[in-house]
């Protein structure tokens, strides 16, 4: 095959692929505008409390042999009463799943509680557009994770994190798609940026506006101004280099890649410093950093907005 023909073939192939993707995107957009039922499910903490307090005791599940029902119910109630207490666990790669948990626990805790109880009783359940049916390895693993801090005694969170990691796959999971003991701290559990945004859309039906990449910083001139504006319209998730944010010795070389998701709760700026308040799984954090360092650590900005009406 000569070079001219080879170039022509690959150019045509790329054009067809781009055209097909464009068609899919336009079709999806049109559907969103015409479907009156395409809204984000919402409920209140009071709704969830009234529901969960009617349940005094759970029987053991035939599907989750290592999950103690009394601890499972206790964990659910803790998440509903104090949603910011949810914790990814020590030495795990569950941070992406912990971060997205902010959405159901704050905006649809009743939907979350019903899903978790159905998953416990039936071994499978549907959340939003996603049908979750965990593998046999996950059914056996939940309730057995050890040396993960408070996650050791929070089996509902173990079920939630393991099921999400088992169901959703991104390119970072390509070489390890099936769970083996200890995989909660390997690439099996990792969450790349596109995978995170896809989970928020499919599970909770949010409109997600994104800027960023896995390996490059977003090209935004006024990063602080952009993020401040996005906070006025929705919940902002920052995808950042956690090693840089928390390193103690600033002369230590660190890999310049993002590893962590945080929920931004507040942001302000003076001439020399930017102050961030954010949820970092288990507690609120407050950090003051320079604008240059702020730009250095951020790789992705996702603004997640509830679909409440259609224009």
Residue spans of the language-model regions?
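Bacterial Sec-dependent N-terminal signal peptides
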Residues: 1-32
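The N-terminal extracellular segments of secreted preproproteins, especially immediately downstream
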Residues: 20-23, 94, 303
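Active-site nucleophile-adjacent alpha helix/oxyanion-hole segment immediately C-terminal to the catalytic cysteine
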Residues: 35, 40-176, 231-237
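Solvent-exposed loop/turn segments at secondary-structure junctions
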Residues: 95, 102, 243-246, 284
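Non-catalytic membrane-recruitment/adaptor modules and adjacent regulatory linkers
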Residues: 150-182, 187-190, 237-242, 271-277, ...
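Hydrophobic, aromatic-enriched interface-forming segments
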Residues: 174-220
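Active-site-adjacent substructure of cysteine-protease-like catalytic cores
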Residues: 211-273
């Amino acid at each position: 095959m000569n070079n001219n023909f080879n170039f022509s073939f690959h150019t045509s192939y790329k054009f067809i692929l781009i055209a097909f993707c464009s068609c899919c995107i336009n079709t999806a957009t049109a559907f969103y505008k015409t479907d009156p039922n395409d809204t984000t499910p919402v409920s209140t903490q009071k709704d969830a409390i009234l529901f969960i307090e009617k349940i005094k005791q759970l029987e053991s599940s035939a599907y989750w042999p290592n999950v103690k029902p009394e601890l499972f119910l206790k964990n659910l109630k803790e998440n509903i009463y104090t949603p910011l207490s949810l914790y990814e666990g020590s030495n795990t790669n569950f941070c992406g799943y912990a971060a997205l948990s902010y959405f159901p626990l704050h905006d649809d805790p009743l939907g979350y509680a019903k899903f978790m109880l159905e998953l416990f009783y039936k071994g499978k359940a549907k959340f939003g557009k996603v049908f979750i049916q965990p593998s046999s390895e996950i059914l056996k693993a939940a309730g057995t994770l050890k040396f993960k801090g408070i996650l050791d005694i929070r089996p509902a969170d173990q079920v939630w994190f393991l099921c999400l990691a088992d169901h959703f796959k991104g390119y970072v999971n390509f070489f390890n798609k099936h769970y083996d003991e200890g995989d909660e701290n390997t690439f099996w559990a990792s969450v790349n940026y596109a995978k995170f945004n896809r989970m928020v859309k499919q599970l909770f039906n949010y409109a997600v506006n994104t800027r960023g990449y896995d390996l490059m910083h977003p090209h935004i001139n006024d990063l602080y101004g952009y993020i401040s504006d996005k906070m006025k319209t929705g919940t902002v998730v920052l995808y950042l280099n956690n090693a840089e944010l928390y390193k103690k010795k600033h002369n230590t070389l660190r890999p310049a890649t993002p590893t962590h998701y945080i929920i931004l709760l507040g942001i302000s700026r003076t001439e020399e410093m930017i102050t961030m308040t954010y949820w970092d799984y288990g507690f609120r954090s407050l950090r003051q950093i320079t604008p240059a360092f702020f730009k250095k650590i951020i790789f992705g900005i996702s603004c997640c907005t509830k679909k409440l009406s259609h224009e």
